[in-house]
Structure formats: C-alpha cells, structure tokens
Amino acid sequence: MKKLLFPIIIIIFSAAETGFSQQQKEWSLVECIKYAIDNNIQIKQQVLQTQFQQNNLEQSKLNLLPTLNGRADHSYSFNRTLDQTTYQYVDQNGQSNQFYLGGSLNLFNGLQNYNTIRKNKYQLLASELDLQSIKDNISLSIALAYLQILLNNELVKATDNQLQITKQQIQKTQKMFDAGSVAKGNLLQIEAQAASEEMQLINMKNQLDISYLTLTQMLELQSPEGFNIVIPEISIDTNMVITGKVDDIFSQAQGLRPEIKSAEMNLTVSEFDLKIARGARSPRLSMNHSMSTMYSSIRKKYTGVIDSITGPVYGEYPFNDQIKDNLNYGFGFSLSLPILNGWQVNKNISNSKISIDNYRYNLEGEKKKLYKSIQQAYADALASLKKFAASLKAVASMEESFRYTEQKFNVGMVTPVDYNAAKTQLLKAQSDMSQAKYEFIFKTKVLDFYKGVPLNLNQ
C-alpha cells in the first residue's frame, strides 16, 4: 500500500506544481504565436508534406543512376533429366542453380529525368512556402483572438465601473428616500438599473471567458483554466498617419507573401510538366548489362580419357568449376521509338498546357486576393482611426454630461430615467471607443505584417 501511495502523492504534487506554474505565467502575443506554430496540427501535417516532397526530389536524382538487380534460382528435377554434357535425357534425379545479375542505364529519354528533377525542386519550394503561409495565417488568427481578449477585458472593466457607480447611487438614493427627499419609485428605478447592469456585466464576463477559450483552443491547450495573457499598455495617437498607399504596400507584399511565391512556383512546376510531356515524343536510348552462370548436379566433366569400349570418360563436375566455366556477361543498347500510343502523348501535352493556364489564373487570383485584403485592411484602418478619434471626443463629452446629470440627480432635479439614459450613453461611447481602438490596432498590424514586420504589440 505504501509503495502505491508514494507515486500517487508525487503525481498529485507534480500536477499541482504544473497548474500553479501555468497560473503564474502570463502569455505575450509573441509567446502565443510561437507556441501555436510549434503545436498546431495543420502545421505538422504540412511539415510532413514538405518532407514528402524532399523525398520525391531525392528520388528523382537517384533515378539517374543505373539499375542493378540480381536473381538466384534453385530447382529440383526427378526421373528424366536433361544432361547438359551429352544433351541426352537420363533417368536420374538432380538439382540445378542459376544466377543472374543485370541492369540498365538510361542514356536519353527526351530529358524527362532532368526536367523531373527541376520540377521537384520547385514543388519542394512551393511546399515550404505553403508551410510559411499556414504559419502566417495562424499568426494572424492568434493576434485577432488575443486582441479580442483585450477588447473584452476593457468592456468588462467599463461595465463594472458603471455598476459600481450605480451601487453608490443606490446608497445615496436610499438616504434621500429615508430623509423623504425622493419618492420610492426613484430608488426602485436605480435598483432596477443596477440589476440590469449586473446582468450586462455577467454577459461581458462570459464573452471574455469565451475569448480566452478560443485562444487556448488555437494554442492546442487542454483547458483555459489558469491561462492569462499580458495586458499591454497600448496608446494610439489620433494624429498618426498610416504610412504607404495601397499600391505601395501591395508592391512590397508581392515579393514577400508566401502564397504569391507558392503560386509562382506551382506555375513553374506546370511548365516543367509540359516539358516532361513533350519529352515522351523523343526516342529512348538505354544501355543494358548482364552477367549469368549456372550449375547442374548431373552434369559431368570430360576427363580427357576415351575408353575404347564406352567412349569418352566423364567425371564429377564441381560446383565452383561449373560456376566459373558457365560465366557469361555482356552489354547492349536498346533504342525505342514512340510511334502510335493511342494519342496519349499528345493528350498529355494538351492537358499540361491547360494546367499552365489554370496555374496562371491561380497566380492572378492570389494577387487579386492579396490586393483586396490590403485594400480592405487599409480602408478599415483609416475608418477605425477616424472612429476612434471621434469616440474619444464622444467619451469626453459623455463623461462631462454624465457628471452634470449625476449632480442634478443627487439634488432631485433629474429623474432616474434621464440618469440611467446618461449612464447608458456613456457606456456605449466607451464600448465604441474600445472597439474602434482594437480594430485599428489589428488592421495596422495586418498592414505591417504584409510589409514583413513581425506581429508584436510592443511596437
């Protein structure tokens, strides 16, 4: 029992220590992105695909080497067996061996092997670029989820602040009601407002929990329990100018974005497919080489003696001697000409041309997709910056208006309905400001990312 209890205690303390460590750690955006890239299943699958393309490239190079294959046969014969010495059948059981070693070397096949090597090089590059594209997409998704947490965190704080103000107002209104300064209806309306804000706060906290869950799922973590992120201090200068125009950013991004480069590589691959298909029209020249020998247990060796009655005298023919004496080797050349093969070569060439056109359209589509993404991000960044600047003014105005309304409410000059309306307008203005702030941050980070700048909230 003691032997069983000790390992269990160790496991419990280890788990507790791990959980405590996770609770103490706060994840930055850079750490989240790195962890996601290291643990994402889609990335791991693409790594395997890249290794697969690497093997294809290596195999295409090895195909230039000559082939060499060996074969060994051992057979038994019963009753009537051909005597290889006299070429007559004898009534005798026997055994025989045959050994063969041969292969071939491709000398010319329309440069198909060389074009296959070059094609596989570009396929490997395309696979590596696809891997980088997946990493980039995951990085952007992580950044969006991270900023969503920051936004929801600010909304929770804003809602909680409004609730605390309402609770303080309940106490003031209670005293005024006890003193007979206000009617009970005023107190009930403020209490109803507090209940509404408590429900709103619960909803905001639920949204925050969901945003944490979303991020931890992207990170492939088992649970969001104990997971926290760094809350950076982010300030926005409303007078800032977004550097670069859409066309300038697009020109820069074309040479950086892996999806564009991958589409270019795939177009090149299709062009080599056409060269390979055309190579099938060429004659094929190969060199063949072989070496063989054999052994038979019933074969006899002429001793050099001739009996006057029976004729030539034969003796045992040892295995090693037969193998040596029967050794045969040589080489030759083979030339084949494709003449008529059901128009397969012509159809393959036609299909390769169609494939080239398809990949050209694919490249054009990727460029248009990138341009539209940059165009949309640029427009969204400008709009959110303007919205943020306007919301700053709105919040300042609403805060001043609310202070004035609150002062009047405290002396009974404003009804609870007007007071609650002022609070609601202030909270909405604060929420709009937070949403515009993080939308602007994300869109500018997307534009910087297209320029080759790593995702980082500290910049």
PLM regions with names:
Residues 20-22, 30, 223, 432-459:
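Acidic, low-complexity, intrinsically disordered peripheral segments
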Residues 23-25, 71-105, 233-241, 275, ...:
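Small/polar, glycine/serine/threonine/aspartate-rich low-complexity segments that form flexible
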Residues 177-181, 409-413, 450:
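A short glycine-centered flexible hinge/capping loop motif at secondary-structure junctions
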